[in-house]
Amino acid sequence: KAKYAIVQAEDELASIGMAIGASWNGARAFTPTSGPGISLMSEFIGFAYYSEVPVVLFNVQRAGPSTGLPPRTQQCDLTLCAYASHGDTKHIMLFPANPAECFEMAVQAFDIAERYQTPVFFMTDLDIGMNDWMIPELDWDDAYTPDRGKILTAADLEALPKYYRYEDRDGDNIAYRT
């Protein structure tokens, strides 16, 4: 039986905060939003980036009422998402071209976020998000195993004299999570 939770947050800050908290506790977590939501989330995005918490943000780019325009298709959030937060951040961004690629690349977004312990932006637009598309039937690979990144088991943790969350044990600049 699948175990998951869907939560309707009261605002963008709560949404990203819950996603980061869920990820910090071992769940694969994401939040959907659009550009104005990314603006509001940027402080939490920086927190996830600097504390190395994997989280996926699905961004349906569009101009809209909060930007003073009627909703329309745009790719207007590229710079915002590439550098969201304060300080020297550079975020991983994925760009699906159609709903079939959204289906395939969403899995990759979670694998990348966990492998590199960082926020990943999944950049769609209003056209993909709202319009009808004709695509081939989607096929899920039942043999798929999530790439959870570098995680220590309870036995691994017991064998260590001391655990340091950000210690680079393998020299690849990626620390182990618990």
Residue ranges and their predicted role:
Residues 105-178:
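Flexible, low-complexity linker and terminal segments
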Residues 84-87:
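Short, flexible turn/loop "capping" segments at secondary-structure junctions
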Residues 1-81, 93-113:
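Thiamine diphosphate
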Residues 90:
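Class I SAM-dependent methyltransferase SAM-binding "motif I" and its flanking Rossmann-like core
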Residues 81-82, 141:
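Glycine-/acidic-rich phosphate or pyrophosphate-binding loops and their flanking alpha/beta elements
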